[in-house]
A protein has these predicted regions:
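C-terminal regulatory/interaction module of P-loop NTP-utilizing enzymes
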Residues: 1-154
Length: 154
């Protein structure tokens, strides 16, 4: 839980203290970190288990890295879902993701929803509507579910 505190100290001081010695930061050292946001980039609205304190946030430059749709498509293809079903599922997830962004909802619709949903659909045990509820709108409040699902064809 105190990993960020240790990292913050190392970034600030330029060295790491170990039991036997101090190790200085390498001249070419670069730290790259990610944070779990609500899927809308560097908004400072993090959903991780431990809040990130201001001093640590201040040590980093924040860049928005959008979901790589080609990677998402490759993840989906790896499941081996029938192409017609895969296309319909991906379209539904992406429409939901757009709805979340446009509505400003604090809901995450990540590529994990695409992958997990495809696996459930491949099993043949669930309808697309059930899978959408289980992977895309899970945990959302009823009014959010309506906004997330607006215009989604299942």
């Amino acid at each position: 839980p105190n990993a960020l505190g240790i990292l913050n100290s190392a970034l600030s001081n330029g060295f790491m203290a170990f039991a036997d010695k101090l190790v200085p930061k390498h001249p070419e050292f670069v730290a790259i970190a990610t944070g779990n946001t609500y899927g809308s980039g560097a908004t400072m609205e993090y959903v991780g288990r431990n809040p990130i304190d201001g001093a640590t946030i201040d040590r980093f430059v924040q860049l928005e890295i959008p979901i790589d749709e080609k990677v998402e498509e490759a993840m989906l293809a790896s499941v081996g879902l029938e192409q017609v079903v895969a296309t319909k599922w991906l379209t539904a997830v992406r429409k939901a993701r757009t709805n979340v962004a446009e509505s400003g909802l604090k809901v995450i619709v990540s590529p994990r929803a695409t992958l997990n949903g495809a696996k459930l659909l491949r099993s043949g045990s669930f309808s697309m509507s059930e899978v959408f509820t289980a992977t895309v709108t899970k945990g959302a409040k009823p009014d959010q579910v309506t906004k997330i699902g607006a215009g989604v064809t299942l």
